[in-house]
């Protein structure tokens, strides 16, 4: 139970005791914005004044009179009727002992669920770009956090491995046998040539369309070329995932091909389809456009595939929750998809599906992040540049470091910096990409968190301690110790809100706050050689474990030295 839920339970019981006529009270508890207001604040009194026809302050006082006070050093009514709570140091000490055990085992939910997270999803024969970076690391972070609390998580890569483009590519490869395609760069160049010919040459277009039919019919020649194209792309994608430390299971669009005809038949049987301009569509009240599920030429589209995927994930994967991570530009599509899946009975309720949308990555001028020629920046090149920038940063700030040490640390620092900069931005917001900012040692950056972690490793080395004791006794005396203890105990709340809102920035905000509290503790409370060395090392141990856990959930790596 988090501190927030503990207080919520107390306030609910106190409200019912003071005012039995209030039905199902739902306490509004928040973390105090300023330390002199205490640790937490209850805002219920202002919401109950109309119901109870009483002054908010009188309501607050009645609630306080019915609260147990054992675990608090202070419970006060302030202002118009706010209730401010300050926990006792003894209570914080007891909670830290429980927190230490929970931190090692994970804050497991009572009722674990099957969560399917669809993220990354690049297209075959195309380079991954910065948009895929956002989907990949947001999806990976959410998967890690859902797993951490005990859920069964299936990470799916819904690769774009089917459609008209493949007929075009197969035709070009058949007719240009001299073209050597050994890697994704070759394939991307070939795609551009094939696309240009498809747009200009009517006969080539017809042959390409015929090859789509051949592919769908299982023609061996077309299938072999298709598999070759997919294998080249997937090898390149896997290199990116290895660099990012992302585990994901491939299940491309082609997987759902056998189910598409029955999806259309099922929608027709349920009388959900309307024919519009010879295309089969599903219309929904409140939407200006329908969801087209079959084109006028009889072909299927990605909406048909997405519906088949939705049904399969519920019926075969037994998903309790489906999360799809794509850019905000696809929001309308997923709203229509959800409405159709609900109407068809593929989703149990609106809680079963969430579209996790994200904003754009911008350059320093506030424009969409692209190359000078206007093309999407290749993700591979961006990651390589991040490592190069980390090398330059280390050479500037750590001139004594050897080339070998730099080569070992730079990849970790560069990739950490890119991930953290993205995850620390609210996912629905656009953010400005800046290597200079993300590699700073101060501010809300991966480097800032890592520096605190490394500082604790330095304490251990100086004291010749291999592993800090997570079972020692805590002794909270100084204000900085109290503030740090409270910050540690708020970690489960950060996990809860991250999962509730499906927004990783709540976790980065927490870790940044914790790091600041630790730095204040390190500044104000002498550790090495002090009479309270063991007790303060215990707090260091909890910070070390919490930072390491939090960074792992973000997909970041730790270092013992910077």
Swiss-Prot record:
GO annotation, biological process: arginyl-tRNA aminoacylation
Q: Which UniProt keywords apply?
A: Aminoacyl-tRNA synthetase, ATP-binding, Cytoplasm, Ligase, Nucleotide-binding, Protein biosynthesis
Q: State where it is primarily located.
A: cytoplasm
**Catalysis: reaction(s):** tRNA(Arg) + L-arginine + ATP = L-arginyl-tRNA(Arg) + AMP + diphosphate
Stated family: Belongs to the class-I aminoacyl-tRNA synthetase family.
Query: HAMAP family, per this entry?
Result: Arg_tRNA_synth
**What is the protein name stated in its UniProt record?**
Arginine--tRNA ligase
């Amino acid at each position: 139970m988090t501190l927030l839920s503990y207080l919520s339970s107390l306030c609910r019981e106190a409200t019912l005791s003071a005012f039995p006529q209030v039905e199902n009270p739902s306490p509004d508890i928040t973390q105090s914005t300023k330390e002199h207001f205490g640790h937490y604040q209850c805002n219920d009194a202002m919401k109950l004044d109309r119901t109870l026809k009483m002054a908010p302050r009188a309501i607050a006082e009645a609630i306080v009179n019915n609260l147990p006070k054992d675990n608090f050093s202070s419970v006060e009514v302030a202002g118009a009727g706010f209730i401010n709570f300050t926990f006792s140091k003894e209570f914080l000490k007891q909670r830290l002992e429980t927190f230490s055990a929970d931190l090692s085992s994970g804050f497991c939910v009572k009722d674990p669920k099957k969560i399917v997270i669809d993220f990354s999803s690049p297209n075959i024969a195309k380079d991954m770009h910065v948009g895929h970076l956002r989907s990949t690391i947001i999806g990976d972070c959410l998967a890690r956090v859902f797993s951490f609390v005990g859920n069964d998580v299936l990470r799916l890569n819904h690769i774009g491995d089917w459609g008209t483009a493949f007929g075009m590519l197969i035709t070009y490869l058949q007719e240009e046998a001299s073209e050597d395609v050994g890697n994704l760069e070759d394939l991307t160049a070939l795609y551009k040539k094939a696309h240009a010919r498809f747009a200009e040459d009517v006969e080539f277009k017809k042959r390409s369309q015929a090859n789509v039919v051949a592919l769908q019919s299982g023609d061996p020649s077309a299938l072999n070329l298709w598999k070759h194209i997919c294998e080249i792309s997937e090898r390149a994608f896997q290199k990116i995932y290895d660099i990012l430390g992302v585990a994901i299971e491939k299940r491309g669009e082609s997987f759902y091909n056998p189910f598409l005809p029955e999806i259309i038949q099922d929608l027709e049987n349920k009388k959900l389809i309307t024919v519009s301009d010879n295309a089969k569509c599903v219309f929904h009240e409140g939407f200006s456009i329908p969801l087209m599920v079959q084109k006028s030429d009889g072909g299927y589209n990605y909406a048909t595939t997405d519906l088949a995927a939705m049904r399969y994930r519920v019926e075969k994967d037994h998903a309790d929750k489906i999360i799809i991570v794509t850019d905000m530009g696809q929001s309308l599509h997923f709203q229509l998809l959800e409405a159709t899946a609900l109407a068809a009975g593929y989703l149990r309720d609106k809680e079963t599906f969430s579209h996790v949308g994200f904003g754009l990555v911008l350059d320093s001028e506030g424009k969409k992040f692209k190359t000078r020629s206007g093309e999407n920046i290749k993700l591979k090149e961006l990651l390589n540049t991040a490592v190069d920038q980390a090398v330059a940063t280390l050479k500037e700030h750590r001139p004594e470091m050897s080339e070998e040490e730099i080569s070992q640390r730079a990849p970790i620092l560069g990739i950490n910096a890119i991930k953290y900069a993205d995850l620390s931005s609210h996912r629905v917001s656009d953010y400005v990409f800046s290597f200079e900012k993300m590699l700073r040692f101060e501010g809300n950056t991966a480097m800032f968190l890592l520096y605190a972690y490394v500082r604790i490793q330095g304490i251990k080395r100086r004291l010749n301690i291999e592993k800090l004791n997570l079972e020692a006794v805590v002794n909270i005396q100084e204000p900085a110790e109290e503030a740090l203890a409270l910050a540690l105990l708020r970690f489960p709340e950060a996990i809860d809100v991250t999962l509730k809102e499906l927004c990783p920035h709540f976790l980065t905000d927490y870790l940044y706050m914790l790091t600041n509290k630790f730095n204040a503790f390190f500044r104000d409370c002498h550790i090495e050689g002090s009479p309270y060395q063991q007790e303060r090392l215990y707090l260091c141990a909890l910070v070390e474990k919490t930072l390491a856990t939090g960074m792992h959930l973000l997909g970041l790596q730790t270092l013992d030295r910077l």
